[in-house]
Amino acid sequence: MSEPRFVHLRVHSDFSMINGIAKVKPLIKACVDNHMVAMGLTDFTNFCGLVRFYGEALSAGVKPIIGADVLVRSELCGDEPFELTLLAKNNIGYHNITLLLSKAYERGYQDLPYLDQAWLAEHREGIIVLSGGHNGDVGKKLLKGHAAEIESAVAFYQDFFPDHFYLSLSRTGRYEEERYVSLALTLAEEKGLPVVATNDVLFLHEDDFEAHEIRVAIHDSYTLDDPKRPKLYTNQQYFRSEQEMCDLFADVPSALENTLLIAQRCNVTIRLGEYFLPQFPTGDLSTEDFLVKKSKEGLEERLKFLFPDEKVRQARRPEYDERLQVELDVINQMGFPGYFLIVMEFIQWSKDNDIPVGPGRGSGAGSLVAYALKITDLDPLEFDLLFERFLNPERVSMPDFDVDFCMDGRDRVIDHVAETYGRGAVSQIITFGTMAAKAVIRDVGRVLGHPYGFVDRISKLIPPDPGMTLAKAFAAEPQLQAVYDSDEEVKALIDMARKLEGVTRNAGKHAGGVVISPGLITDFSPLYCDSEGKHPVTHFDKNDVEYAGLVKFDFLGLRTLTIIKWALDMINTRLAKEGKPPVDIATIPLDDPASFELLKRSETTAVFQLESRGMKDLIKRLQPDCFEDIIALVALFRPGPLESGMVQNFIDRKHGNEVVAYPDPEYQHDSLKPILEPTYGVIVYQEQVMQIAQELAGYTLGGADLLRRAMGKKKPEEMAAQREIFEKGAIQKGVDGELAMKIFDLVEKFAGYGFNKSHSAAYALVSYQTLWLKTHYPAEFMAAVMTSEMDNTDKIVGLYDECLRMGLKVAPPDINTGKHHFSVNEYGEIVYGIGAIKGVGEGPIEALISAREQGGIFKDLFDLCARVDLKKINRRTFESLILSGAFDKLGPHRAALSKNLEDALKASDQHAKDAAMGQADMFGVLTESHEDVEKAYASTPRWSEKVILEGERETLGLYLSSHPISPYLKELAHYSATRLKDLVPNSRGQMSTVSGLLVSSRFAVTKKGNRLGIATLDDRSGRLDITLFGEALDKYADKLQKDTVIIVSGQVSFDEFSGGLKMSVRELMSLDEARSRYAKSLAICLSEENMKPTFIRELKALLTPYSGGTLPIYVYYASTAGQCRVKMGVQWSVNPTDQLFTELAEKLGENAVELEFQS
């Protein structure tokens, strides 16, 4: 191979985010293909790609040069920032660039982060500076021809970076670039400055230029043809070959030679794959001994709880002691005692500070040491959970506890960790958003200037599934391939989108990842902050940050823990008033019969993980009656097991409809019974795979974990090796080789569906806790759940329906007793949370509750207005509170409150003015007009029920005092016998008929371009989504009117998207049509009170507008003398409309009018 002549020192990957589209791996491959011995990755103001670049480069035999392109400001250049390239000459330089990048983000920035030139002087050691070409400070001054300023600019680098400053030259066809090169070469000769050739690489190939321009336009929010779009780049900024660069700079050979010289000078060594933990304070003991001490103390406490009887405890102790010792030996030998102690401390702090912590998550629940240290709350021995699934001495990797915290307290825990280990030693982790399939189509389409409808049509052909790619979309949606093949514009758009798919678009914060450093985070990674310089995160993502040596801790927020806390707070407050002991959720029995009865009835709405329609169906079929069944439910309710048929095997075996075998009637072994008995012989868990390998073939559990992973990967060479090991081990244990391999094949088949039992058991415990709370404290539990959904009106509606089904009363919001959140009053009623009222913010609520706490309950509307700070509550807020029912106790009815609101506000305003003048007489202000107020109240007619309900729906999102459909329920039973809550999917060819209030409707277009109507029915027992296609839509579209009552017939099926049911409508009737079809007659009941001389004339006048119909009228008359039934003549027959019934009810009374049907 010939001697190298050039290397690229200034290259951007897609991690630059403002420009650059090349991925790190293809860049390294380009180096190898072009025989380049080194490469400098200099992404804009970040090291985000550094770890993978460093690793990939070394693996490929390419020397990695660490650097970054930065913006700098100086006194000389004023507010105009300039570009520099900083390269790390050694580890000191690497550390200094890390500090500089961190400082740029930490001080905040408006558009792009930048450095101060003074910082460069301060952190200059170990850094080589490339001048930034025509965009650098020297370049800008050269182009402007300011001799004195050129002198000053150069002097800075000669003073602070002697022998470490290079004038960078590039020839990419950019504006003023060639003039700069000429001036720079002259300056270099005059000042004795070295020059270096770069190509400012942004993409791999010349034909990637348009894709790059689109990427930049997406970032900058331009369209490609916008005349205002800055054109900063050219098609020459690709990864030029060595020969191309040599040809380009043949006239400046030193510029080429210096790339190699700089590459030789840059020698940074980064320690990857090691782990560095902060020192946990352990006093005089070593970290290992301290872990042993705390674990043994914790186990003793746990054993006293698990086995209160001393004899039983002593009998069980040896197996716990032995397991603990095995785990401690592994943890200490692998060097992880500090990790366990750190997690122990922040979890204990959380519990001490009333921040709920989950019982465990993931494989960590399989550790007895974790249980002893109270990191987890599930006894791993009781549920056959394996430590080796978490930490395997035969597969060295960091332990990884994912810890769930109450949503409200999670940030407090992270703050505590920062206080404990130092703010500079704790950071959250960056995460990167990429151009995903749907989004990249939309973005590219917008930049190319396509109409919204055109782009939307293509985007909607891409399935919304997580992890969807364009390649997967083409495989899943034939129409996408068809439109791609038939439309050149579509093809061009998709081809361009393919080039940009997966390109890093932006940076964000990882949901739960936190790193704790033994020193400063900046010893390992720069810090990236938001524009205000807050919320620091590492430049390395969750994988790279661990590879760089920092240990990741996952602090996850679980809403269910917050719900449990809120429920317990309400429960224990009530129990304290009653003189009863509090509920400790950690000590509830796991075999509560009442809880399992509720579970078997599938009444699991709001129960963690068990509330979806599909899960409810599985519960009905399984009829779980023990905690192990709940663990299995969590593991089985996934696409793989559901589609494989093993779920049905599990159900059939539980109910005796299939032989229980271990694992199969044809191929079983007695030694597997203890392993598979809890799951009726079905291999459900990964731990069972490991135990079978241990029991049948003599694997260590560590080796069995490797087998499990190999089965998951399905690599033929690995599986061939494992089959051999399994067969040999089984024969050595006296098991028939053929039988062993038959069982191996079965295990391999189910291993792909196997779930981590440790995670399933831990989450099953949370599920059970919510189930137990719903069973024994339903009001408090549902109030807590509704509080958690206060911002989601649709969810509140569903939960309210569930409360009605449970027999719980939900009282309207009450300004005198209610709280911001949902609560439970002394009558066991759930009181609607004031914070859930639309149009009422936290500020007004705080003002109202503060006034109530200071002066007691409000006597009336005038009293309230006089006592609250009206600067914090506007008129619209008061109106929302009246409409919602929150002020019902402040006046006779809502209409009166609404009418007198203006007077109450004026009186309050007058009171405030008088108080300011020293003439305060609140009671005078309020009582002077007391009689007038009473008169105003008395003279104000009540709102109709319809108006009241519309106000409730407007402010609460639901009907609380009643329901618009309530007056019709008796009548609707004649048209449809099935309530929505009782609906089940139809068999083929069958149809169901239901009725309800149409609460929403819309029209859409399918992927194939066909119209469909989508609507939602509500009959107060539940809700149902209905769809209308083709002929049905054409026939009934005009009847999909919101807030009307309709009767529909159609095919009912599961809705996989929502987890509920849906109906495809075949027939639809309005209420008037149903009456005309099914009603026999209209009954009018009269009494002596009605029979005024003018009554017949008035009744005829009322009925005349509705005459000409086919429904006959019967009059029932009752008096002291007797009763009779009279059929009115044909000329009296009417059309049975709602308006007619309303007028008759107003005239005769609601109970005097009724439809009659055939018996």
Swiss-Prot record:
Its EC number is 2.7.7.7. Keywords: Cytoplasm, DNA replication, DNA-directed DNA polymerase, Nucleotidyltransferase, Transferase. It comes from the Bacteria. It catalyses: DNA(n) + a 2'-deoxyribonucleoside 5'-triphosphate = DNA(n+1) + diphosphate. GO terms for cellular component: cytoplasm. GO terms for biological process: DNA replication. DNA polymerase III is a complex, multichain enzyme responsible for most of the replicative synthesis in bacteria. This DNA polymerase also exhibits 3' to 5' exonuclease activity. The alpha chain is the DNA polymerase. This is DNA polymerase III subunit alpha. The gene is dnaE.
